[in-house]
Structures are given as C-alpha cells and as structure tokens.
Amino acid sequence: DKAVADGWVPGETLFGIEEACEKGTIVMCLLSDAAVMSVWPTIKPYLTAGKALYFSHGFAITWNDRTGVVPPADIDVIMVAPKGSGTSLRTMFLEGRGLNSSYAIYQDATGKAYEKTIALGIGIGSGYLFETTFQREATSDLTGERGSLMGAIQGLLLAQYEVLRENGHTPSEAFNETVEE
C-alpha cells in the first residue's frame, strides 16, 4: 500500500518477488536478515549469469554457512550499506538528501561490479561512499547497533536510574529524570 501511495504502479513499476527478480538485472535484497534467509530459495533461481545481487547489509553473505545464502559464481555480489536507520534514510531521500554509505564487492563476475556499486551508491543519495568488506560491515553494524544503540544507551540509563535511587530519589523521580530529561 505504501508503494502504491508513493506512485508505484502494480504490473508496471511494482512487481512480486519472482517477477521482479526475473525482470531485473540488479536484484536488490533489501530485507531483514531473517527475511533474506526465508526468501533466498525464491530468489536464487532467478540469479542468472551476468546479473548482480545487491545487499544493504553484509550479514547474509558473511555468515552464509549459517544463512544458506550462497550466490551463483557467475553473478556480481555487491553492497551499499547506508550508515543510518531505514527511517532516517527514507526521510532524507524524500528531502533530496542522503546518508554516508559503505560499499563492498564480494564477487565480480562481470568485471563491472565496481561501476554498478558506485552508481547505486550515488543513486540512493549517499553523500560519501567508503570502501569496506561484507564481513567488516556486518561486524561493525552488529556491534554498533547491539553495543552502542541498544546496549550502551540502555546501560547508561539504568546506571543513572540506579545512582539516583541510591541517592534518595523516589522511583518516579529517578525514572522521570532519566527518561524525560
């Protein structure tokens, strides 16, 4: 529904997974890690010689022994990974701006993977592109999200709450000072 509201037209510019993969020369796999694993059997048959498989995160390829995502040898496997949340990326795109992105080439079967990757990075509005690998992107993304965004912030908030409680603040006061301020 969101795609249609944004002007995509079913059967003209909007397709189901199989039809999109069949028609496309660059198959963009922009799904959650769990979703990539579940749709991989659907996508793989359409990855014919010369196509490119594009990711925005290195997880599925880095741990392909666990995800089962093993691309055919005769396709390019590329990545442009915006350094921000999907919500931020979408908001900035609608404003005509972009986020910095890392890029990587896992497999260059056509000899054109670099050109495709840089063009896609520019096309999505990346303000700055810097080279990485799928493995480094996956590791830095997971440690950044799980360590800094989830773990560190939560730990700081908990520590502040506990210090306030230890110093005589009521639970309500400690909570509000921690969360509301």
Residue ranges: model-predicted function:
Residues 123-181:
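Helical "substrate-binding/catalytic lid" subdomain
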Residues 11-14, 30-33, 37, 107-115, ...:
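Electropositive phosphate-/nucleotide-binding environments in soluble metabolic enzymes
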Residues 19-21, 86, 137, 180-181:
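Short secondary-structure capping/turn micro-motifs that flank functional sites
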Residues 54-146:
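Rossmann-fold dinucleotide-binding core
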Residues 4-62, 70-85:
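Rossmann-like NAD(P)-binding element
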